[in-house]
Amino acid sequence: FLKYVTDVYIEKKEEYTKKYEGNEERVKRALERERFIVPEESSFYFLYENRSSPKIGEMINHALAELEEANREKLGGHDGSNIFRNIDFNSSNLGDAKGKVTRLRTLLNDFYPLILSSSHLESNDVIGGAYEFLIANFASDSGKKAGEFFTPAEVSTLLAKLTKSKSGSRIYD
């Protein structure tokens, strides 16, 4: 998620810089209206530059907290909870101090070469696609009961193509 929002944010920043001929104030205002705001220390690339730090777990936790704060309306729950607060990249579950840094560095190294900006992806809805993937796997792993409520996108598309809708027609799921 962090790599995706960082790449999209950087791409938008480059677009606005070109559009507004380097006027930083206009670029800043335009970026504030984007889907997500990515503070500098929350950027994937900031973390990547610091990937060998013995405090990389704490840095990732801080980056996610700052990202939540900058996007409170989108990433905060209605009850005031935040989606990343229960994730701890500094947890002893990741191993001893050296092992933890190694694992997190490897994770950052694996994501670094991927370009996840909108112009490089087949679909702009990466988050929706990931969510649909998780729901589909939950439905198939949970048996028929959970699967009763999930219709794969391919089935929906096929049904839409097979039905010849007429003006005023309605389709119900």
Where in the sequence are the language-model features?
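Non-catalytic, mostly N-terminal accessory regions of nucleic-acid modification and defense proteins
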Residues: F1-S167
